[in-house]
Amino acid sequence: MSEESWQELVDLDRLRAWMDGRGLGDGQLDGATPLSGGTQNVLLRFVRNGRAYVLRRSPRSPRGDGNETNRREARVLSALATTDVPHPRLIAHETSPDILGAAFYLMEPIDGFNATVGLPDLHAGDAAVRRRMAFALVDGALALGRVDYNAAGLAGFGKVEGFLQRQVPRWRALLDSYRAYDEWPGPGSIPALDEVADWLNRNQPAGMTPGLMHGDYHLANVMYRNDSPELAAIVDWELTTIGDPLLDMGWIIATWPDPDGSTTSEIGVKPWTGFPTIEELMAYYASQSQRDTSQLRWYGVLGCYKLGLILEGTYARSCAGKASVTTGERLHNSCIKLFERAQRWMT
């Protein structure tokens, strides 16, 4: 994000006055710097009285209700404060759009790195460290699934009833909505679409134990400690809900690179040597989880199905000239790879 674009969305004078009213330091907001990330949300780091902050607010034209999404994120971060889930610490939040034009919150900066962007020397130079990084990712999903969401104040945060039954029709409806985009070739360009959907419906687990789930859990949405292979924080909480936490492991199954480092969804790390296979991670998850993991493959197939249909949306928009053609074709290719992976897990 350019300096000009973030300045249009974050009025530092109004933010400073708001912080004054909250007792969050005094004086100027120094060193305001936009941070890159995996979303279109505004992330702005600044310092006041020697304390660093990161502000997060929705973009100018968010998909859906950006204010409600931001409020939900802040609620989750607040609820996680007393848990062992690694997360950015919430400092304060504003639910009204009156201050900056959108709801926003302030959190502590994370001392860590995104492995999909690059590895520091400690991690790049030691295959054993990289191996542990993978299990740390799974540990994060396990910790999140163990949270007592009622005790944490998140009762009613998601629609538990019929959660699994809604998945296939919900994401198929999203795919069908892409017909509104001119020149999109339609569902027929996705291999085995109906076959995967039918398999998911036939093999759907009989029940689930509801829990807190991230909703987009993969290597690019965590940050690692600079001094160890452990997680520093899980980030990008905008899809978090109460549902079936096994789907977070299913998301790992869908996005985990193959042994040669090739990926279904452009989420990878270099060097890839040292990282365990997805089968090893599934076995580890099953050994550490108190949930019924006998149908973990089903969640992996669902992860492929869901992510593939979400990515196809960018391709559909690109066909109508509403997104980059290059990006659209790249993500359509990822969709195809995800459905090919789903077919392999179905056998």
Locate predicted features.
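Active-site activation/catalytic loop segments of kinase-like enzymes and analogous catalytic loops
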Residues: 247-289, 303-320
